[in-house]
């Protein structure tokens, strides 16, 4: 692809995630956490893929910016007609961007279902995790210093 065409596509995708062309001239260290997430999303959609992978898309963001990123993910995915696979520990994010959820525990899938059914999964591991309780079948090891 010609450099000019790639730059034009980059500016369009940056605009899709609410960033102006001036962001393209900045170094990564000059971007805020939210801007970095937006640039990452623009990069992910640049080739208009059929499948997009997200790894902790809202990690390190305050709840408001996390919600902004979730909205952008939902909008971009809808506009592209893409399928996504997201890995997250952020239940607010999972509830907003997912249609279906799978929970893994110790490398095994222990529950799969529609996000609308996660609160009534009947799975004690899922229940403990989504409610953020220390007590339950998931035991966290704490090592002495």
Residue ranges of model-derived segments:
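Conserved ABC ATPase "signature" region
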Residues: 5-22
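Conserved ABC ATPase signature
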Residues: 27-31, 35
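Conserved catalytic motifs of ABC-family nucleotide-binding domains
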Residues: 48
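Catalytic Walker B motif of ABC-type/P-loop ATPase nucleotide-binding domains
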Residues: 52-55
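Helical segment within the ABC ATPase nucleotide-binding domain
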Residues: 67-80
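A short, surface-exposed alpha-helical micro-motif characterized by mixed small hydrophobic
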Residues: 94-96
